[in-house]
């Protein structure tokens, strides 16, 4: 008869519960809810599969909850008299891709890459085809700004080509 390692069993069974608990208690939940109400920011997740205790990929619940943790925080949970530490850090590169690193204790580690796609309310997406002159490829990017949870973040569009920003012609 095979014996189950109690620590491994608890980590397997509580990994989703831990994410759910953080989802409920996280102050960033309200920030995400505010952004989703305005419908000016859509986040698409690209999950990189990894081997987690024999599972072939991340479970559906974890995929739905991971996008809420877009901050640099460390949480401490006391679950069943065992302390688990969840560290979350993130960065946004120049191509507006957000890389989120999540570590629960020393047992769970995953990388989530999400591409931020913006939608201009009431009009079409601005065009960058002629904004960069002869420089190619010229693509539309959104400049990040820091906003509190109680205010809507304005979208600032720029055209980017080879590391240099250009004004968006349709918005000037």
From Swiss-Prot:
* Highest rank taxon of the organism: Eukaryota
Disulfide bridge map: 128-159, 132-138, 135-161, 147-153
According to its UniProt entry, the protein's GO biological process terms are: guard cell differentiation; stomatal complex development
Span of the secretion signal?
A: 1-27
Q: Where in the cell is it found?
A: Secreted
GO cellular component terms given for this protein: extracellular region
* Broad class of the protein's primary localization: secreted
UniProt keyword Methyltransferase, yes or no: no
| Keyword tags | Developmental protein, Disulfide bond, Secreted, Signal
The keyword Secreted belongs to this UniProt entry's keyword annotation:
yes
Q: Which family does it belong to?
A: Belongs to the plant cysteine rich small secretory peptide family. Epidermal patterning factor subfamily.
What is the annotated role of this protein in its UniProt record?
Controls stomatal patterning.
The name of this protein is EPIDERMAL PATTERNING FACTOR-like protein 7
The organism's taxonomy opens as:
Eukaryota, Viridiplantae, Streptophyta, Embryophyta, Tracheophyta
